[in-house]
Structures are given as C-alpha cells and as structure tokens.
C-alpha cells in the first residue's frame, strides 16, 4: 500500500493503480489535542491487505499547517478526481467540524456519487442534513434512472473501509 500525503506531488500518483481518497474532517496544525481518524483508517486498510494507493489529505508532520497553502485545495481536488473510490468517514465533533467536508460531500455526490462510500459514527455531531441528502439523492436518481441506487450509511470505520474495498473491487473487475 502506498500512502500519499500532501508532501507527495499529486502528479506523481499513478491513478492506474487502485486508489482510495480518505475524505472527512482534518485535524489542523493548531489542534494538537486531537488525533486524526485517518490513522485508524490506514491501519484498517493495511489489515485488509489493500495494495493500492491511499490518499491521505494530511501532512506527515501533524504540526504543519495548511494556512495560506492555496495549493492544498487543488492537490485535494486532483486527488479526489483521480481516485477510484472516495471514502467519506465523518466523525464530526464540535472541535472537528469538517466544513470543507460538507462541500466535498455535496460536490462529489452531484458529480460522481457512484465512487463514494459514506460513513459516520452514530454519535457524530449534526449529521442529519448530510444523511437526508444522501438518501434523497439516491431516491431521486433511482426514479430518474429507473434503477435502484444504493444509499447505505455505514456507522463504523471498519465497515466503511470494507465497503470502500468492495466498491473498488467491483470497479476493477
């Protein structure tokens, strides 16, 4: 498994290899009291023997800040665009609010929903809106396309990772 972080130029990523983007709230450099959920996600992918690219939109040094780094949103957009699966895990809290995550979730749901997996813990803060939009968008698409569009909302990180790998394997058959 290749771990790709902000220090890796996104143009160096081989998107011909199975690629998963870990989307969700990011611990910022000014939040040293918080721990990134992505550490557990990386461990879960490793335990399941994932052998592709894992895009981790964070710095290797957790004290690093993205403040005034206007290249970071472009890096993330290119990573999201090139990935085969966008795994949204949203363990939202009052400290880890995920405002950019809200935008990304809506944008990619409208643009390429079929490559999204959506999960969040049952106790995540203020998730009702995203949950409702996820389900209502699936209903609308199902009606328009006359085909059932799945809309599971996973409630554990492990089940979200497994669903991402399942989607990735379907996509590459």
Regions found by a protein language model. Give the residues of each.
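Conserved catalytic or regulatory cores that recognize and/or transform ribose-phosphate-containing ligands
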Residues: 1-173
């Amino acid at each position: 498994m290749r771990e790709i972080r902000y220090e890796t130029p996104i143009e160096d990523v081989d998107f011909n290899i199975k690629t998963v983007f870990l989307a969700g709230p990011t611990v910022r450099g000014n939040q040293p009291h918080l721990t990134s959920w992505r550490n557990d996600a990386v461990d879960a992918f490793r335990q399941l023997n994932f052998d592709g690219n894992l895009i981790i939109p964070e710095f290797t040094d957790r004290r690093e800040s993205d403040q005034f780094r206007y290249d970071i949103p472009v890096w993330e957009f290119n990573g999201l665009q090139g990935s085969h699966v966008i795994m949204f895990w949203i363990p939202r809290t009052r400290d880890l609010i995920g405002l950019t995550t809200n935008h990304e979730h809506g944008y990619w749901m409208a643009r390429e929903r079929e490559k999204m997996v959506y999960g969040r813990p049952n106790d995540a803060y203020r998730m009702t809106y995203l949950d409702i939009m996820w389900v209502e968008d699936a209903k609308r698409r199902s009606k328009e396309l006359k085909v059932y569009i799945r809309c599971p909302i996973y409630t554990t990180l492990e089940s979200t990772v497994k669903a991402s790998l399942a989607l990735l394997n379907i996509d590459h058959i």
